[in-house]
Design a protein with these regions (language model features):
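Positively charged n-region of N-terminal signal peptides that target proteins for export
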Residues: 1-4, 89
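Non-catalytic RNA-recognition surface used by pseudouridine synthases
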Residues: 7
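Hydrophobic h-region of N-terminal signal peptides that target proteins for export
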Residues: 10-18
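Mature catalytic domains of secreted/periplasmic carbohydrate-active enzymes
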Residues: 19-410
Length: 410
């Protein structure tokens, strides 16, 4: 009873403070820290990893929710080691991790009291979020928590345009009950696991084709988060310009402003920190036949192009069902880490350089230095800056294996 009263009071206070969001000093400091880190690793892991067909397998194959839920009784990631994950990611030069606490399949990867459909009811029986939180805090890696607004399993979730073949009874939809469920889960995550640096939402687009606009009641939910942890950032992968209460702007599979994948055509709002999320291979969740990994040079150039837009790169890996990270993904992390140890000063703590020449030269800058990144296949013979200044690279005309950098004092 006391827990219920406390939650209701917290939500009431959050509702009252949802209007005219003003970030706290702690939140503004978190925004700067986030932007300075520039590189994070996304981890999509849930029951779907066992099917090895990607994170949307449940809805793509129209699997009945009750039948799908039985897979939890076989989930036993006996080789999972949170400290090893975090160590590998830190060695890669990443400053934060974003982990899927609950994806669209509705399975919770922590010890939640709000549903029996969670990691503690599996043969594994250990709180994955707890282990990751402890490892991140020990190794000074920021922890961001992905949370889906969609649930293909719960009948109280008002179905949108996905998950329609999972056998839920649509007559049982109950938005107030589902909204309360989500807020209770978010309260658990923000009160039981120490410092959480960002809540990363996904799924708003599930109702973007409704004839009557769907009210997700986001301002109140965002206010709840900020009340529980004022420094915690809020981001939402809704593919729209930021809504009130959000602290970062997210772009899916695209560098801000480019929209080549067709998911991120929203206007870039430079008043907030920016983040691009992208896959290391093709899928977000583990797919056994997806070996289409991007080369290390491609990933490094993506990081450079993203930083040159003043944005962070959130690079995804889909862990395997046994709890290990794929060998190729680990190799790419090591290769990126090697490059960042030599060149991280041109990425970390920088902002958009403002100088772009064609497709082959982009830039970052700090207080007194402009870093010209030559990312074309060949190093140019000379570079003319907008100011008229001409620079002749000492390796002009040579093959460019990755990223040739020229530092220009301002």
């Amino acid at each position: 009873m006391k827990r219920n009263a406390l939650l209701l009071l917290t939500i009431l206070c959050a509702t009252l403070s949802a209007q005219n969001y003003r970030p706290t000093a702690e939140n503004l400091a978190s925004r700067k820290d986030f932007a300075d880190r520039r590189f994070g690793v996304f981890l999509h892991w849930g029951l779907y990893s066992m099917f090895a067909q990607g994170e949307w397998y449940m809805t793509n194959a129209d699997i009945n929710a009750e039948e799908y839920a039985k897979s939890m009784h076989a989930f036993y990631p006996h080789r999972f080691n949170a400290r090893e994950w975090v160590s590998a990611i830190k060695d890669a030069g990443a400053g934060y991790i974003c982990f899927t606490t609950r994806h669209h399949e509705g399975f919770s990867m922590w010890d939640t009291r709000q549903s029996d459909y969670n990691i503690m009811r599996t043969p594994y029986g250990k709180d994955v979020v707890r282990q990751l939180a402890d490892a991140c805090h020990e190794q000074d890696i920021r922890l961001h928590l992905y949370y889906s607004h969609i649930d293909w399993t719960r009948p109280d979730y008002p179905s949108g345009r996905t998950g329609l073949g999972t056998g839920r009874d649509s007559t049982l939809r109950d938005w107030p009950a589902y909204y309360d469920f989500m807020n209770r889960q978010l309260t658990e995550l923000l009160t039981n696991y120490g410092r959480i640096d960002c809540i990363w939402f996904d799924g708003w687009w599930d109702h973007d084709q409704d004839s009557i606009p769907f009210d997700w009641q986001l301002p109140e939910q965002y206010a709840l988060i900020h009340r529980l942890q004022p420094a915690c950032l809020v981001g939402n992968n809704h593919h729209q310009v930021p809504f009130e209460g959000e602290d970062i702007q997210i772009f899916e599979r695209d560098v801000p402003g480019e929209n080549e994948a067709g998911l991120s055509g929203q206007e870039v709002q430079d008043v907030l920190p920016l983040e691009t999320c992208q896959t290391m291979n093709g899928m977000w969740g583990y797919k056994i036949k997806d070996q289409n990994y991007k080369s290390a040079a491609t990933l490094i150039r993506l990081l450079v192009r993203t930083a040159a837009k003043g944005a962070n790169l959130l690079l995804n890996i889909g862990p395997q069902p046994d709890g290990t990270l794929p060998a190729t993904a680990l190799r790419r992390l090591r290769e990126m880490g090697e490059w960042l140890r030599a060149n991280g000063h041109t990425i970390y703590g920088t902002r958009a350089g403002g100088v772009t020449i064609g497709d082959d030269i982009v830039s970052t800058r700090n207080d007194d230095t402009l870093f010209l990144h030559c990312i074309g296949d060949t190093i140019p013979n000379e570079i003319t800056l907008p100011s008229g200044r001409t620079i002749k690279p000492d390796r002009a005309g040579e093959r460019n294996d990755c990223d040739y950098i020229i530092s220009v004092r301002l």
